[in-house]
Amino acid sequence: MALYHLFSHPIERAYRAGLCSKAALFLLLATALTYIPPLLVAFRSHGFWLKRSNYEEQPNVRFQHQVLLVALLGPEPGAFLAWSTYPTFNRLQGVHLRVPLVSTREEDRNQDGKMDVLYFKLELPLQSTEQVLGVQLILTFSYQLHRMSTFEMQSMAFLQSSFAVPGSQLHVNGDLRLQQKQPLSYRGLDVRYNVSVINGTSPFAHDYDLTHIVAAYQERNVTTVLSDPNPIWLVGRAAEAPFVIDAVIRYPVEVISYQPGFWEMIKFAWIQYVSILLIFLWVFERIKIFVFQNQVVTSIPVAVPQGEIRKEHLS
């Protein structure tokens, strides 16, 4: 009579040995070599602990309508005109004070509630004999980030341009970019730099010196700079025409560097560890099968149906 394959079920093979046997010692060693080396490999390959991460955010930037201007004149050396929105600075200038006409406008182009660009125009009246050879200009801003930690600071854009020939207009088109010397925190409120760039209440001339202002500003770990201003210097001014500064300053999306939190570090480390662990699990599983099947270490093989193994585990 012919025989047919009617039914089948898998059989698990168990290997039994004492807890103090060579088989138990081998299994303990194999387990240790399965789980510990992946941790060492992941750690020694660097980048195991995520110390810095990045994200994108559109900053909330507003122009504070605080301006400090120094116009360098020629051909006499040391001649200049100055003006600012700080009354004390203006009083200190004496005959060098010249009040310009300033107009500004901020625009939210994508209607997301955050300003995207500043249009700044300054017209400095000049006498027919006065010639502008260079400009130093400070504009101050309120700068805020909210996606991770709440970061607030008062920052500035510093523009300095000088040319060999007298000019009639200076056109500037650049981005207000964030510069970080250290990452921000991933949570909390950071207002350490939410102080005026220029101390407008000080009666001392030293506090309005550009060298002092820029040096103190550069001591910060987080600043803004006017990036790629692309200055265009136009010549040929009419006798009674003012000197014009026309600036377009954009507030672009920034890549913010921050210190990740504990659980983010654990998640990043766990992904690296598991990806290496899977390889070790596969390798040592086959090593254990070879060792026990070929009785490299003494053990007693027992065939156990899968259903009985499940019952043993449940019991």
Curated annotation (Swiss-Prot):
> Its quaternary structure?
Part of the tectonic-like complex (also named B9 complex). Interacts with TMEM107.
Q: Where in the cell is it found?
A: Cell projection, Cilium membrane
> What GO cellular component entries does it have?
ciliary membrane; ciliary transition zone; membrane; MKS complex
Membrane topology recorded in Swiss-Prot or TrEMBL: Multi-pass membrane protein
Q: What is this protein called?
A: Transmembrane protein 231
Protein purpose: Transmembrane component of the tectonic-like complex, a complex localized at the transition zone of primary cilia and acting as a barrier that prevents diffusion of transmembrane proteins between the cilia and plasma membranes. Required for ciliogenesis and sonic hedgehog/SHH signaling.
UniProt superkingdom: Eukaryota
Q: Which family does it belong to?
A: Belongs to the TMEM231 family.
For the biological process aspect of GO, one term held by this record is: regulation of protein localization
Q: Which InterPro entries match?
A: TMEM231 (IPR019306)
